[in-house]
Amino acid sequence: MVKIAFTGGGTVGHVSVNLSLIPTALEKGHEAFYIGSKQGIEREMITSQLPETTYYPISSGKLRRYLSVENLKDVFKVVKGIGDARKVLKRERPDIVFSKGGFVSVPVILAAKSLNIPTIVHESDLTPGLANKIAIKFAKRLYTTFEDTLKYVPHEKSDFVGATIREDLKHGHQQNGYALTGFTPNKKILLVMGGSMGSLKINEAIRRHLDELLQTYQIIHLTGKGLVASNINQDGYVQYEFVKEELTDLLAITDTVVSRAGANAIYEFLTLRIPMLLIPLGLDQSRGDQIDNAKYFEKQGYATMLDESELSSDTLLLALTELEKNRHQYIQNMESFTESYTRHDLLEKIIQDALQLEVGA
């Protein structure tokens, strides 16, 4: 049996793969624990959805690509985080560290390297983020979701593994989705997702044309924490800050989705053959990874993309109208998407590589 230290955080995308792997690891008799930040979204997700998994909070600092006085403060946080992670790893003595990226993962990877514990880094996006660019230098293996990512990373330690799809994704129950929302199967359902923190701009665009949109859809709106508009109470429109295990049931009744462009979410929509309008985070809020993702899937004919800089209630409505007009073509294009681009046995590969790395240590 193998003991795995999981890490990764900052966004849902940096946690969701770990959320699917940990229960499988435990069911197969392996041991698992989590190292994350003290206040990040990963702490809430892991402790609430996997209460049997020990969560170790460590100090962490944000990695910025621009000059800021905060960078100096965060250097000390990262150094403390390395010390925190070393204490945890020395106590738990895992066979392998599996990292999904995000700034909290860097101290863990560095601590593991100092203790000669092998690490595997998983990159979901088309191009590696800053945290993973640092982590790759100290990791034994890198797994990529996109085959094209291999152009940007060291070939000798990299494997294209495809997207990791949750086992329960296709097992959502429509009756539960309808019961939760109060909706009916007689009218299309639009799911709006603004990412881990929600999106004020997407929320505003949806609400400005709500009456018009409700003529075509029933709408499930995942607004983000603290962004539910309590003054809006209309039939066919439900709001949630965030959903957890209910998401599979909501996806089971979804006809069309408006979403940010995190790779994990896109692959899930693609697996379920849900036509999607992708509104990636702009360059003012990110390094452009979601823009790359959205352009990639749009080029494949799987989605349509709306640049956030062009987002308004009018452009959103127009983009959705065009998407609906061509929805059957998008679904047909998605049928060409094969299971070879997804992976259901990632845990087995992690275990296999962990044993090989242990032998080769």
List the predicted regions and their residue ranges:
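A short, well-ordered alpha-helix in the C-terminal region of glycosyltransferases
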Residues: 328-340
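C-terminal "capping" alpha-helix adjacent to the active site of nucleotide-linked donor transferases
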Residues: 300, 304-307, 311-328
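Conserved nucleotide-sugar phosphate-binding/catalytic loop shared by glycosyltransferases and other
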Residues: 3-8, 26-76, 307-309
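Active-site-proximal region of nucleotide-activated glycan assembly enzymes
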Residues: 3, 31, 52-54, 113-175
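An amphipathic, basic-hydrophobic alpha-helix
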Residues: 67-96
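Donor-nucleotide binding loops and adjacent catalytic segments primarily
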Residues: 40-51, 174-176, 183-256, 291-295, ...
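Acidic donor-binding loop of glycosyltransferase active sites
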Residues: 94-96, 252-267, 274-275
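C-terminal alpha-helical cap of glycosyltransferases
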Residues: 340-361
